[in-house]
Amino acid sequence: MESLVVHTVNAIWCIVIVGIFSVGYHVYGRAVVEQWRMRRSLKLQGVKGPPPSIFNGNVSEMQRIQSEAKHCSGDNIISHDYSSSLFPHFDHWRKQYGRIYTYSTGLKQHLYINHPEMVKELSQTNTLNLGRITHITKRLNPILGNGIITSNGPHWAHQRRIIAYEFTHDKIKGMVGLMVESAMPMLNKWEEMVKRGGEMGCDIRVDEDLKDVSADVIAKACFGSSFSKGKAIFSMIRDLLTAITKRSVLFRFNGFTDMVFGSKKHGDVDIDALEMELESSIWETVKEREIECKDTHKKDLMQLILEGAMRSCDGNLWDKSAYRRFVVDNCKSIYFAGHDSTAVSVSWCLMLLALNPSWQVKIRDEILSSCKNGIPDAESIPNLKTVTMVIQETMRLYPPAPIVGREASKDIRLGDLVVPKGVCIWTLIPALHRDPEIWGPDANDFKPERFSEGISKACKYPQSYIPFGLGPRTCVGKNFGMMEVKVLVSLIVSKFSFTLSPTYQHSPSHKLLVEPQHGVVIRVV
């Protein structure tokens, strides 16, 4: 009898296991067929690409190309096309298949587009059926949640309407004083370091200090607090970013195991616990600020956004959990985007100015003639044409986010090309920004004067200049970011003359943003 029970249990387990694998095989098989359909549809329209393997697509080839890629030699920093070392597979296949080609990673089919006319079509497409890439946004959820950066469809459009209103140019003009105030402790610290250095000057690693300033600006503008109070939040975001980006988002496998079990290994970091701690800290900060704002008429950016969200409900009450989700997810987005991208852009700008001291002189002269006491304000910033040109050229050579990614939730037409539902579209911004056919033979050179008549006349295809992304999903905080970069560059250059330190190592790295792996070290005199 006991033996019969054992055999029965074993038989049941066998049936269950076979059933699970049968269902998994069936689902996986359907996914493979669907991917084949997408690839065939693109091929029939003349889109070529590397032949994929049945299980992992072109991942193995991508990894091989990456391992063989040559990194920067350091001979010519400015002309260095870092995209060929950070994203060598894109460059490798472009030489083989042209500016439009297709490839796959596991069960995901991708379409690479770097043709100016197709980028223009992509930029002018307003459909909600072209959103963020779902498998990447899912992976970035601990950092960004389902806020304005990662959400799709009507949910994204709703958040965009609420948040964009508070980031218009007129709204942010009043924050210039706050930006100057946040920068002063850093500038005073640098002045003391220069005094101690004497005639030889001193070496300063600027990127870390700039991150502190950017964090302070975001903390004050959004939550009425200082960086010191929000330091734990920024630290958690950096820890999450480091853990999640250890494995390239572009190499994600998306095969059978990912489909059934997910992919949640991120080294030794407990992502779930860190995410919960981050969200709790943000929520506590918001609730504390709500109480403080009851006793004052002065409201920070987040309070204004929340009021806009409440008005958008047309009298309907928010579900409590939905309200908290909206608050936390968009705080994550603002913390991350406002903190890192601005600091990185200013760091690259100082690196380029260190190599081009004549542009430091031009900026300094402009600031002295336009800004009272050499300090920019809301009235003088629009007159800083040279500063603007230098920043635009910096963002051409070193755009903060190097890639635009979209996924078609339905069949989408881009010009003469029909992109099948489920295809992920990629545009490599540095490749567009350094293309000689678009920018001329000096595309790799630092020449801010190319923007002397504005973006529309800076190159052959102005729609190819996309440092803040493209289309309706252009960065909602670009006015805020540009204003802060102008303020910081103006203040630094007006007070200091500098060159690159001999210890500087030029090594751009990719962690969602293109960052200086070893920092930016300048010699200030």
From Swiss-Prot:
Top-rank lineage group of the source organism: Eukaryota
Observed phenotype of the null mutant: No visible phenotype; due to the redundancy with CYP714A1. Cyp714a1 and cyp714a2 double mutants flower earlier and have an increased plant size and biomass.
Enzyme class: oxidoreductase
Cellular localization per UniProt: Endoplasmic reticulum membrane
GO molecular function per UniProt: heme binding; iron ion binding; monooxygenase activity; oxidoreductase activity, acting on paired donors, with incorporation or reduction of molecular oxygen
One Pfam family it belongs to: p450
Topology, Cytoplasmic side: 25-525
Record's protein name: Cytochrome P450 714A2
Organism name: Arabidopsis thaliana
